């Protein structure tokens, strides 16, 4: 789940919880070097980053194949509409097989995890559909059988030039906006 620095200026948005990355910074992640030649990539996007997500997935060398929609039990934030969904794009590279082809393209999980955390059931879906090995970028907690990378967890991999910056463009703009009003 990339920390998108897109439309994050509200008092309850992602900028209040963690450092953010611009779409260019996310695109610059060396995902091609971290994945096998035959691989699946599941990329979480918000409603506001859906189009950008497709571009980034393709820039990493993956062909978009499907979209999984998480229907949330509570009404969330939104710039235009109050979002109750989040999406995960599924892309493939090479000839990675699909292990389970009857997976519905949506899920409703009755317990909504804390801000930006994804439901545990989603990891089960990934393991059912995609062959391993598994790597979660921007991970928050370890999962058995998965490698992890993120600034909130002991990472299994190193990505030169990263971790997530502590001060994103949105946070800096918000700081200046508040300073001008003071």
Give the location of each predicted region:
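Class I S-adenosyl-L-methionine-dependent methyltransferase catalytic core
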Residues: 2-182
